[in-house]
Amino acid sequence: MFKKLFRQDENILNSELAEDLPIPRHVAIIMDGNGRWAKKRFLPRIAGHKEGMDVVKRVTRYANAIGIDVLTLYAFSTENWKRPTDEVDFLMKLPVEFFDSFVPELIEENVRVNVMGYRENLPNHTMRAVEKAIADTAHCTGLTLNFALNYGGRSEIITAAKEAMKELELEGKSADDLTEEKLNDHLMSSGLGDPDLLIRTSGELRLSNFMLWQLAYSEFYFTDTHWPDFSKEDFLQAIIEYQNRSRRFGGL
């Protein structure tokens, strides 16, 4: 059944994309607008998060279908702990339900789960769900579904710099020997590559402390669509927009 779901998406999506233009290798998404989506429908905010979880599953299928290597989703920031307790509690339970229902499909489709963020601050039930999903899909070699969970870009850079400096000290070197490559090796996203395309939903035009180092030369795509309404057509439009841009990385 899972194979059928993925193959249907593959046929529809690939028919819409230009074959002679590049597909982004790494797509990152700031999934914004769950609360606004719920408010518009006179529903509690958690209803938006619940609907958003289903969209994560669909977008994962789309990304896998067109051959994206890494899909990074901003699930929970280090600042999100400031939200109401009942909302935070619900968000910390979502990974349990999400992975329990979706990991069998991910395994069948050779999708590997990765999580970057400060795991030590997560509740035990969330941590167990995360670690089990990572372990259960560790053998998979296809798409990497990477969640930024309890993640903050500034903290990540500081942590990476400290770790890089400690390594340099052990090597008998100084701060003058610190390079971009050395720092990059200690980022939470090390080994995944920088995002080629950042998508942000719900009309907000900011990064919100997300992958500040890695997004230096990424292409940005903003849409007014709230995350729970983000459709196959919205995803396709973002990819097509990327295909029609010229990436210069600071050159001409």
UniProtKB/Swiss-Prot annotation:
An individual GO BP term: polyprenol biosynthetic process
Entry's EC annotation: 2.5.1.-
CDD domains: Cis_IPPS (cd00475)
Ligand binding (substrate): 33-37, 45, 49, 77-79, 81, 83, 200, 206-208
The keyword Metal-binding is assigned to this record: yes
A GO CC term assigned to this protein in UniProt: cytosol
Cofactor binding, note field: Binds 2 magnesium ions per subunit.
Entry binding sites for Mg(2+): 32, 219
InterPro entries xrefs: UPP_synth-like, UPP_synth-like_CS, UPP_synth-like_sf
The protein's name in its UniProt record: Isoprenyl transferase
UniProt organism field: Listeria monocytogenes serotype 4b (strain F2365)
